[in-house]
Design a protein with these regions (language model features):
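PRY/SPRY (B30.2) beta-sandwich protein-interaction domains
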Residues: 2-529
Length: 529
C-alpha cells in the first residue's frame, strides 16, 4: 500500500527541472507579470487621455504609441487584448470605442493569435458576474470579426464562441453584455458562411431571442433603446425571417415630414425605419445630413443623446464633405459647425474650441459631478440657427452652452441639420414632429417639420440589402457619373486627367477617387445640345 502511494505521488509531481531551468521559468513568469502590469497601466492611461485628442493630425498619446509597439509581436498583442478585457471599466463612456481604436491601429493579428485569445477567454464558460469583462470580450470579438472578415472570421466563430454570444442574449442579466453580443453577432454575419450559421442557431430556439429585444427600441431607458435598435437592425438586415415583416412596412410615419437623408449619408451609419434615429457601430466616423434645407429665418431642432460618447452634432451645407475613414465629419471643414458634448468642444474647420466651464451638477448615474456643458445619456441638445443675426447657439437641457458665428464667414445659406458619430454612439433627432422639450424662449423660430413635405416614397428607409438590390435593377447610362450614377459625367480632374464625375460630385472631392492624387482644378466639358 505504501509503495502504491509513493508511485502515485511521483506521477503527480511536476517534471524535474535543473536549477538553471527553474530560474529561467521564474524569470519568464516575473517578466510576464511585469509586462501585464505595464500594459494594464498603458491601457488605463490611454482611456484617460483619449478625450484630449482633438486633432486628426495630432500625435497619439505616448501610451498608445507604447501599446502599438508592444502589439507588434504576437505575445504583446495577446497581452494588450487581455489587459483591455481586464481593466477597461463599464462606466467609462469611451471604453468600447478605445478598444476599437487600439485594435484598429495595432498590426493585423493572425488567425492563430485570435484563436489563442478566444481560448484564453474560455468562452465555453459563458455568463459570470464580471459584466465589464464580458462586455469587453464581446467588443473584442466583434472587432476581430470585422478586421478578419472571410475565412479567418469563420474560424474564429467556433461552437464555443457562437454558444457564448447566443447564451449572453438568453441568460445575461446585464444589458451592456447583451448589446455588445448583438453587435459581435452582426460583425460575424458580415461573412456569408457565418451569417447562415448564426441564423440557423437563432432559428433553433422556440422563439428567436432577438424578437423580445426588438420591443425595446422605443424604451425610455437609453440602454434598452440601444439594445432594441440593434436587435431590429439585425432582424431587418441580416437575420431575416419570412414570418416577420420589415420594420419599414410597419413603422408609423404619421406627422414626420423631415428625416435623416438615406441618400446623403456615409456608408456604415445605421438609420432607424422612422428616419429619426442614427447609430454607428463601425470603427469609422460616420456622418449624415437631414432632408430639409434652410436659407433664411430662425430654425431649431433637438437631439436626444442616447449614448454619452463622442458625436459632433450641428449644421452643415452640401459643400461639407464626409470622409469617414479619415475621421473627418461635421465641423471638420469650413462649411459645417458642430458641438461635441462629450469633450465639451465646438468644431469648425477641423479645429476645436473649448467651451467655457459651466457650474457643475450632480450626475445621479455615476454619483459624480459633471459640467452643465457636458452631455450624458438622456440629455437633450438644442441646436438653434438664426440667419437674421447670423449666429448658432447650442443648449443642453434648456441651458445655453455656447453661441457661435464663425460658420458664416464661409456660408450664408443652404444649411442642413447634420451629425457625425464615433463607434457605438447613437442619438435621436426631433425636427418638430413631436413637441420640443426645451424650445427657445428669447426669439420666434420655426421647425423643419412645420414647413417641409415628404412624399410617401421619400419616407421609406429600406434595409441595406433591399436598397442595394434596388440599385442593381437601375439602368445606368454610359455617360453617368461614376459616383452618384445620376447626373452626366462632364468633369475632368487636374492634374491627373481622370474623368467620369458630375459637377456636383466633383465639388465634394479633395482627392481623385481613381489615383488618390490631390485635385488642384476641375474642368467642365461643354455639353453639346
Amino acid at each position: 500500500m505504501g509503495t502504491c502511494f509513493c508511485k502515485d505521488r511521483i506521477e503527480e509531481r511536476e517534471p524535474y527541472l535543473a536549477p538553471r531551468s527553474r530560474r529561467a521559468t521564474v524569470c519568464e513568469r516575473n517578466s510576464k507579470n511585469i509586462l501585464a502590469e505595464q500594459v494594464n497601466k498603458l491601457v488605463l492611461d490611454t482611456l484617460a487621455m483619449i478625450g484630449s485628442i482633438v486633432d486628426n493630425e495630432q500625435d497619439p498619446p505616448m501610451a498608445m504609441v507604447c501599446l502599438h509597439s508592444i502589439a507588434d509581436k504576437e505575445a504583446g498583442w495577446i497581452q494588450v487584448v487581455e489587459s483591455m478585457v481586464d481593466v477597461i471599466p463599464m462606466d467609462h463612456p469611451l471604453g468600447p470605442s478605445v478598444i476599437t481604436l487600439l485594435l484598429d491601429d495595432c498590426p493585423l493579428p493572425s488567425k492563430d493569435s485570435v484563436i489563442k485569445v478566444s481560448k484564453l477567454f474560455d468562452l465555453s464558460m459563458s455568463g459570470g458576474e464580471d459584466s465589464a469583462r464580458h462586455r469587453n470580450i464581446c467588443v473584442i470579438l466583434g472587432c476581430m470579426a470585422e478586421k478578419l472578415a472571410g475565412p479567418s472570421s469563420v474560424a474564429i466563430l467556433s461552437k464555443d464562441t457562437l454558444h457564448y454570444l447566443i447564451n449572453n442574449l438568453i441568460s445575461s442579466p446585464d444589458l451592456h453584455v447583451i448589446l455588445f453580443s448583438l453587435i459581435a453577432l452582426e460583425k460575424f454575419a458580415q461573412t456569408s458562411e457565418n451569417k447562415a450559421t448564426i441564423k440557423k442557431k437563432l432559428s433553433s430556439h422556440p422563439v428567436n431571442p432577438l424578437y423580445k429585444f426588438e420591443a425595446l427600441c422605443s424604451s425610455e431607458s437609453c440602454l434598452e433603446r440601444q439594445v432594441g435598435f440593434c436587435a431590429r437592425w439585425c432582424l431587418d438586415n441580416l437575420f431575416v425571417s419570412n414570418e416577420r415583416k420589415y420594420s419599414y412596412e410597419t413603422v408609423d410615419l404619421t406627422g414626420i415630414e423631415v428625416m435623416l437623408n438615406t441618400r446623403d449619408v456615409s456608408e456604415y451609419l445605421k438609420i432607424s425605419p422612422d428616419g429619426l434615429e442614427a447609430r454607428c457601430d463601425s470603427y469609422s466616423f460616420e456622418s449624415v445630413r437631414c432632408t430639409f434645407q434652410v436659407d433664411n429665418g430662425v430654425w431649431y431642432y433637438e437631439t436626444l443623446i442616447i449614448t454619452s460618447g463622442i458625436m459632433q452634432i450641428g449644421w452643415a451645407t452640401k459643400d461639407s464633405t464626409f470622409l469617414n475613414h479619415e475621421g473627418y465629419g461635421i465641423g471638420d471643414d469650413e462649411f459645417s459647425l458642430a458641438y461635441d458634448g462629450c469633450r465639451r468642444l465646438v468644431w469648425h474647420g477641423a479645429r476645436s474650441h473649448a467651451v467655457p466651464d459651466k457650474p457643475c451638477i450632480n450626475d445621479s448615474t455615476n454619483n459624480t459631478e459633471r459640467s452643465m456643458s457636458q452631455w450624458e445619456s438622456g440629455s437633450i441638445l438644442g441646436c438653434l440657427l438664426d440667419l437674421n443675426k447670423m449666429e448658432i447657439s447650442f443648449s443642453l437641457d434648456g441651458v445655453e452652452v455656447v453661441v457661435c458665428t464663425q460658420l458664416f464667414e464661409h456660408a450664408k445659406s443652404g444649411f442642413f441639420a447634420a451629425a457625425s458619430f464615433m463607434s457605438f454612439q447613437q442619438c435621436k433627432f426631433n425636427f418638430g414632429s413631436e413637441p420640443f422639450k426645451y424650445p427657445p424662449t428669447d426669439r420666434a423660430f420655426k421647425s423643419f417639420n412645420s414647413i417641409a413635405k415628404l412624399n410617401p416614397e421619400e419616407k421609406i428607409v429600406l434595409p441595406r440589402h433591399l436598397y442595394l438590390e434596388q440599385l442593381r435593377k437601375l439602368s445606368i447610362h454610359e455617360d453617368s457619373c461614376t459616383l452618384c450614377f445620376d447626373k452626366r459625367a462632364t468633369v475632368t480632374l487636374h492634374p491627373c486627367q481622370h474623368r467620369g464625375f458630375c459637377v456636383d460630385c466633383s465639388k465634394l472631392l479633395l482627392h481623385c477617387p481613381m489615383c488618390r492624387s490631390m485635385i488642384y482644378k476641375s474642368e467642365q466639358e461643354e455639353i453639346s445640345s
